[in-house]
Amino acid sequence: MNEAAARDIAEWRYPEEYSMYDFSGYEEEEKQLFNGLHFPVYEKEIGEFALVGFVSVGPAAQVVGRSSRKIYEDESATDIGLGLRPDLCGQGKGLGLRLVELAVAFVKSEFPDDNVRLTVAAQHKRAVKVYERAAFVKTEEFRKMMPGVNGKKRPCRFVVMILK
């Protein structure tokens, strides 16, 4: 992750129901963009390459908490996390699916024997549908307190999915 991409990603703002994915105001999360486990994704737009998303791999893609710790002890799977630029979400152009396929291809090239696992907030049905289209299946669920609007924590249900 280079500094310019990290700065751009840190400024992305999602609609309120997806705001848990904003980096803004969470300096620790912003620093994590430089931990070597986050990769910017560029796509050619109007003749030049533009930042369209990012992929996180391994521990950077896990939603760790008391109720999920056991799930991530299974080291036969490599975790992926995905972030699509907010203005590109929900447009029906298949960008989310392309990002998932890119992440899976990367993990499979680096760790061919590993399963591929991801974790998504259950209420984000649009993302769950994309992952299902990419051949992921739900395997487990857990709850974790997450930052909400105005910094108030709220319970959130997460779904763990494995690539078939």
Regions found by a protein language model. Name each.
Residues 3, 7, 11-91, 97-100, ...:
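Acetyl-CoA-dependent GNAT
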Residues 25-29, 142-149:
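Short, solvent-exposed loop/turn elements at beta->coil junctions and helix N-caps
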Residues 112, 117-128, 144-156:
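Conserved beta-strand-loop-alpha-helix junction that forms the acyl-donor binding cleft
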Residues 58, 117-119, 139:
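Solvent-exposed beta-strand sheet faces enriched in polar/charged residues
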Residues 36-38, 154-161:
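Short hydrophobic/aromatic beta-strand or adjacent loop that forms the aromatic wall/cage
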Residues 81, 117-119, 160:
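Short aromatic/hydrophobic contact patches that present stacked aromatics
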Residues 71-76, 151-157:
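A generic structural micro-feature
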